[in-house]
């Protein structure tokens, strides 16, 4: 029994039995009786290739489902189901498991987290969903709990602000998942939740690594960020990106010219040498400045 089995209990054990000697018999279920559930995996890549493989060889691994009323809910195998529909199949092989709603949610979340093609953003949502399900809290409450745990560890709040039992459970789950510590998750993954939409999209598409997304997040100017994003997609290294971002941030923080410097530039300015439109704009601004300066104090 693995650490994850011990922590999450019967849901995972039932899923493993479905793949072993105690597996229920394989049934052929019509596609129109199958329903999918919400899950952290939003993208389904290479469906056409899988659909072609299914046309040639069929579905090699049965779906895992549970009975819900007159239909069946897919617990594991949504990608195969979608590809089967693309391939024109009318029915698919499946094993029916006796799972409660909570067990089904846990098993589906763990199945998705164990996939190799989850990108960091989807994985982050999946981990939060798993914690939410296990702790009986909303995702927002889980995020708040994790941040309180971090603050408590760093001595910024009193320890008793964080419920001990919940903190211990969080630590157990992260150890069982074996991916990263909860501290690393808070530091490196929670910031992904507040990414601008363009960076979220690029991350979900697998176009950029999450480290680049976090670096690009520092650039507030959308047009500059877009230009840098395209460079990252074209192969700009993280080291080069960090240097570019530092340059952008330096310019953003640079002090604006002092009045004397502006006055010196105006003294050197030859208005007659400017193009008509630009000269008219400068004269308009100078007139506005004069009105402001001569106004009541």
Swiss-Prot record:
GO cellular component, one term: chromosome
Alphabetized UniProt keyword annotations: Chromosome partition, DNA-binding, Plasmid
Keyword DNA-binding attached: yes
GO biological process: chromosome segregation
Listed SMART domains: ParB
Short name of one Pfam family: ParBc
Domain of life according to the entry: Bacteria
An example Gene Ontology molecular-function term: DNA binding
Function of the molecule: Probably involved in plasmid DNA partitioning.
Protein family: Belongs to the ParB family.
Protein name: Probable plasmid-partitioning protein ParB
Source species: Thermus thermophilus (strain ATCC BAA-163 / DSM 7039 / HB27)
Encoding gene (name): parB
């Amino acid at each position: 029994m693995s650490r994850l089995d011990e922590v999450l209990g019967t849901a995972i054990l039932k899923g493993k039995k479905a793949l072993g000697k105690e597996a229920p018999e394989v049934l052929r279920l019509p596609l129109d009786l199958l329903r999918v559930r919400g899950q952290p995996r939003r993208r389904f890549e290479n469906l056409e290739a899988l659909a072609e493989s299914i046309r040639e060889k069929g579905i090699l691994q049965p779906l895992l489902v549970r009975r819900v009323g007159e239909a069946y809910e897919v617990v594991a195998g949504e990608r195969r189901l979608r590809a089967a529909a693309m391939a024109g199949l009318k029915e698919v092989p499946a094993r029916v498991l006796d799972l409660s709603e909570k067990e089904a949610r846990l098993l589906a979340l763990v199945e998705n987290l164990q996939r190799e093609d989850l990108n960091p953003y989807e994985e982050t949502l999946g981990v939060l969903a798993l914690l939410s399900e296990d702790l009986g809290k909303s995702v927002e409450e889980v995020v708040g709990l994790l941040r309180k745990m971090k603050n408590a560890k760093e001595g910024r709040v009193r320890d008793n602000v964080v419920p001990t039992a919940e903190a211990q459970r969080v630590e157990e789950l992260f150890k069982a998942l074996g991916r990263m510590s909860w501290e690393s998750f808070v530091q490196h993954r929670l910031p992904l939740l507040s990414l601008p939409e363009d960076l979220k999209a690029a991350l979900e598409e697998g176009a950029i690594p999450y480290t680049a997304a976090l670096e690009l997040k520092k650039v507030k100017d959308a047009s500059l960020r877009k230009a840098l994003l395209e460079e990252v997609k074209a192969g700009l290294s993280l080291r080069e990106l960090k240097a570019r971002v530092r340059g952008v941030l330096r310019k953003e923080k640079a002090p604006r010219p002092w009045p004397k410097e502006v006055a010196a530039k105006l003294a050197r300015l030859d208005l007659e040498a400017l193009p008509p439109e630009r000269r008219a704009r400068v004269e308009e601004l100078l007139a506005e400045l004069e009105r402001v300066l001569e106004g009541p104090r």
